[in-house]
Amino acid sequence: MAKLIASYKSDGPEPKTIYEKYLDHTSNYKQQYGERTIVLMMVGSFYEVYGLKSASGDISGSEIVAFSQICQMNISEKKKVSVNGNTVLMAGFPEYTLERYLQKLSDVGFTSVVIIQDEENSVHGDKKKHIVHSIHSAGTFISYDVEQPKLSNNIMCVWLSSYNSLVKSRAQLVYGVAVINIFTGKSFIFEHKTTFENNPTTFDELERAVSIYNPCEVILLYDLAKITENESALVKNIKSYAGIDCNSIHEFCIRDSTKTENCMKQQYIVQLLETFFGSECYETCEEFSRYPVATQSFCYLLNFIQEHNPSLIKKIHTPTFGSTSVNAILANHTLKQLNIIEDKSADSVRSGKFSSVLNFLNRACTPIGKRRIQDLLTSPVFDEEWLNNEYNMISQMLSAENYHFISFFRKQLADVTDLEKIMRQILVKKVSPSTVFRLYESVLKIQQIHVCLEENRELMDYLPNSECIAKASETICSKISGFLVVDACKNINSATVSEHIVKKGVDSELDALMQEYQVANDLLNGIHRFLNMVLRASLNLPDDSDYVKMNTTEKMGSSLQITKTRSKVLKQLLEKDEYSGMPCFRGILTKVKTGTVLFHGSMIEFGDLKFKPATTTAEEITFDQLTKLTSKVLKLEHGIEHKIAVLYAEFVEKVLENECYEHIDKIVEYVASLDVLQSKTYVAKENRYCRPQIADGEHSFLKAVGIRHCLIEHLQQNEIYVANDVEISSGGILLYGTNAVGKTSLIRAIGIATILAQCGFFVPCSSFQFKPYQSFYTRILGNDNLYKGLSTFGVEMSEL
């Protein structure tokens, strides 16, 4: 859970009741984050949501109805409780299920404000003082779960600003975009300037960013007064043009916000950036000053996340800038028109792994590798040295002496968990013991891979951090196994740790508690066994059943219970004292005096034995020694549980964050490069792709023999696929032909192959020679349907 980040105080008179406090908080946070905001207030051991119901049946005050539908909760009325004449409604859930419902609310775009009881500052036992603990939204929520199908959780901020140019007659538009992936801490910013036209083309670059990053939460900041009087209508159009359709969208006018005003001040920007990226970062990273609107957007986003959960932006990566000296330009929806990424059509979705080039060719085995390949395939480059290095490594891995490594890599990497996400969970203190177990097991897998590769000098030179992986792996494993009983952590998925997972010798106070608990628990178990043996021996009962049962509850601890009928028998047997001479007790029981025996070395004093009702059919066995013993065991259990929780929290911060974090980071880069390499190699081998050859030339060109469309050749299995030869020089070519002969398919195949080559992949050709391109422009009408095998003409005919 996040640290305390705010304590709200109303400007008006102090609300008298908890219901008024709740409604006051709700009103305040709705103003900040919009109508889709819900306050979760801790009351006792529950989180509760309140609302008001008028005499006419109207419900107001909060989003309690939506909350009940999303979380499948019942709404109840508080009897004899009202606020301003309105009946108070209530819904809620136990404290320990908070994580589950935060996930549900975040998934549908709600912002959840978690308010807890301030136990430390309550006066005279008053438990009704409350403080804001954390704020969660779709783009700022990170759970304890590691094994999620969702690879990224991106939050995006778009800053739209209009201005009048001295050299241009028409109004100009500039928009800066910032994206942060809270699963990895990586960020991206870019800026685009253009003459304003109210059409989709103006927002091509924005649409490309939205398509690539698929944000789950978007903040739209706008000042479009120089363009239109109806800014809200234009913002609605912009969302449509850019494909912004996530559940959580916040819209703010720049002129009406103090926060945006701060983000336009250079002193504030410099101070904020230096806080996260070190002193002089503004001067050394010239892109911050070159792209001021994008930087403003980034600063606003940092502040927004910090308000929600300050830990999320600890050790955040310096942003990647959209325009670099080696990245090719992708214009006019290139990625979608070439099916590099999904177009989200029904036919595309039904096609599964063939829905896009990315889905088909991304054969990475780890979430880390899958994210890295997505970044690669959406950012082609024209850096010839880097490209040739990638081709060389794939060729080397395809050789007979190395290809056997690929199956080994895929098997080992399949068991490697999302280490990047775990790094963020460590920073926000949301690491369950089961996550630590997965981290430990994953590092062992990486260690095994590294041992096998140490003799391969070329591969070691290619993989980043290869020289320190052995030390990093050993450090992480030794730190974890030196503190925790690793196997005991395997199935503990919550933050509440009740099992004994801390190793003996780590903490002397815990060891003393454990020793005392062991002695007390052994005595309790001894009493339990003794009473059962008395019944079995005296009545010749089978040995495979307990006639005196141990009943344990979290609140009351352990107790010994027996049926009412057998309780009378047991009392008589103990009073007659005939059991002590029976053969089964020989050598293990000594009678000290009436009502006192020495059983297996433990003194049991049951002289004051009594029975009290426990249930309708059972009674609880009590005597002074047993009552004190069960109370002591319960107290020790709570003490041990608290001590383990404290030690585990210290372990996460002092060991995982302070001592292991940098080592995990090095392993992440190593795994990412290894997984991407094996994926590229595996795809090339499985699909018979060839190595691109980069040729010298004054201008970009390509010459492909036997070029194929990487999706169509798998989607259309009912006909023989006919490959094509094509050569495009600086003058281009005119491609023409009759209907349904594959013109569009060939155009797409050329575009896909060239982009694959410039992403460091082998390509679906017999041979492919080219000079890398610095920009890609596509204009392919989306009237065909490659998933159904229909050309543009075929689609038109089928619609008749």
Question: Across the structure, where does each feature detected by a protein language model lie?
Answer:
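ATPase nucleotide-binding head domains, primarily ABC-like/P-loop NTPase cores
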Residues: 171-173, 287, 291, 569-576, ...
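Long, charged, glycine-rich C-terminal linkers/tails
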Residues: 117-118, 312-322, 531-552, 679-706, ...
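Structured, non-catalytic alpha/beta "coupling" segments that mediate domain-domain communication
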Residues: 219, 294-339, 349-350, 359-360, ...
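Basic, polar low-complexity surface loops/patches
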Residues: 1-373, 378, 385-399, 403, ...
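N-terminal accessory targeting/assembly segments
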Residues: 505-556
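SMC-family hinge/dimerization module
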Residues: 308, 312-361, 547-550, 554-607, ...
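Residue-level signature of catalytic and energy-coupling elements of molecular machines
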Residues: 44, 105, 218, 369, ...
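A conserved P-loop NTPase coupling/switch region
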Residues: 46-79, 217-219, 223-278, 355, ...
